């Protein structure tokens, strides 16, 4: 029988919900910075592409994020803790070979952490080009990343208190910016109709391969489960309702701008920054940059937790683990910190722009999600005693969705070979 944890039964308060915003939604919450731009790319802008893209984003968030992670996967708490290795700890006695999806999932999740901070921070900083044309962004991004990793040894107990309020401001900004465009062109809401997703995937030339870009909207879903121990199931589920509304409103707002901006192609523009009023552009970029830093911090902390769990399961060599503050659960692993810093800076120098990073981002996390689905099926059958036919149906649906994303992301291997090598090295260490 699963042990209950007080973190799941504690009273939901405004303060606890704001804390949840600052801890777990950084990755998925900063996706509007680059997702629609990645979908449109250099293609001609038309109704099927724009509305189909929004429709795919909406239904991906419904199925992959809301149903699979927020509803189903959060049920699998290991004494209040979440994450793929905690899930493995719950089911490992039901099959010796389950160690394979556990290690593979953990490996790809850690490898994904090499490119998430660079793409998030670079996407935000590149907005400065609208205010200060020709300003070199690469040095700024490297300085921010380096400062972030240097700061890790001191812990985030004090500054962590502002993460929640900053992310609350960020999501409110997403909501207002999106709504300001929707009220101008309300007809774009019809993009939520799954018919447009069907049109994009089956009728639009090369539409299926656009799933590789659509997937970027849900890459942060795994973090919702990984950070279960920090926030609790109830806080995640309630706060997700607010976050989802803000995200969708912004995506639809960007689509409204795309449908009425008057140009055949994006011409290098980012829809996210185009819907920000000129008078608010600099404050908006500053808020976006802070949100991207918080998103990166959450991922770095998650990497420490992942390695700590791997050490406890004898999946990773024993390395120095420090506790920089008295805050429960906060750890710092110098060797992992150095590894992530080198990987992130290398990614910035190699790709040079967020557009190039988009072409490589998402491949690893599709594998993590498929491995989570495999482990989750054993949890539902053997721990929750769900009907096997029901579980097989669930696995089939999510397996089909995730395998489609995986196939669409395979074309990214060409630009992802260095990170593929990094992932292989991590897998060999484990």
Predicted features, each with a name:
Residues 1-430:
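The structured alpha-helical core of multi-pass membrane proteins
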């Amino acid at each position: 029988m699963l042990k209950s944890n007080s973190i799941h039964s504690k009273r939901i308060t405004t303060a606890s919900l704001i804390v949840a915003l600052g801890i777990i939604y950084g990755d998925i919450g900063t996706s509007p910075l680059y997702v629609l731009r990645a979908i449109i790319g250099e293609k001609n802008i038309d109704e099927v592409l724009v509305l189909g893209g929004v429709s795919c984003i909406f239904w991906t968030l419904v199925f992959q994020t809301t149903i699979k992670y927020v509803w189903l996967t959060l049920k699998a708490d290991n004494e209040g803790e979440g994450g793929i290795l905690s899930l493995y700890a719950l089911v490992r006695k039901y099959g010796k070979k389950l160690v394979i999806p556990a290690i593979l999932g953990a490996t790809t999740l850690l490898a994904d952490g090499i490119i998430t901070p660079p793409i998030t921070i670079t996407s935000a900083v590149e907005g400065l080009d609208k205010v200060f044309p020709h300003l070199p962004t690469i040095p700024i991004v490297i300085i921010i990343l380096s400062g972030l990793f240097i700061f890790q040894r001191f812990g985030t107990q004090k500054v962590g208190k502002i993460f929640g309020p900053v992310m609350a401001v960020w999501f409110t900004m997403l909501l207002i910016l999106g709504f300001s465009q929707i009220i101008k062109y309300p007809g774009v809401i019809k993009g939520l109709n799954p018919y447009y997703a069907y049109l994009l995937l089956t009728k639009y030339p090369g539409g299926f391969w656009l799933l590789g870009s659509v997937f970027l909207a849900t890459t942060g879903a795994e973090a919702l489960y990984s950070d279960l121990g920090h926030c609790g199931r109830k806080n995640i589920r309630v706060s997700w309702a607010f976050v989802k509304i803000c995200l969708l409103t912004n995506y639809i707002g960007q689509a409204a701008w795309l449908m009425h901006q008057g140009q055949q192609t994006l011409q290098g523009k980012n829809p996210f920054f185009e819907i920000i009023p000129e008078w608010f552009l600099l404050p908006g970029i500053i808020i976006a940059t802070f949100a991207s830093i918080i998103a990166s911090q959450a991922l770095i902390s998650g990497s420490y937790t992942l390695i700590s769990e791997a050490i406890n399961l004898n999946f990773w060599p024993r390395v120095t683990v420090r506790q920089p503050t008295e805050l429960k659960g906060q750890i710092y692993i110098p060797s992992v910190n150095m590894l992530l810093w080198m990987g992130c800076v290398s990614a910035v120098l190699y790709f040079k722009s967020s557009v190039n990073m988009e072409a490589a981002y998402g491949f690893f996390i599709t594998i993590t999600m498929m491995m989570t689905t495999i482990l989750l099926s054993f949890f539902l059958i053997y721990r929750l005693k769900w009907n096997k036919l029901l579980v097989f149906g669930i696995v089939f649906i999510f397996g089909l969705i995730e395998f489609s994303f995986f196939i669409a992301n395979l074309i990214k291997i060409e630009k992802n070979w260095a990170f593929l090598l990094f992932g292989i090295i991590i897998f060999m260490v484990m």
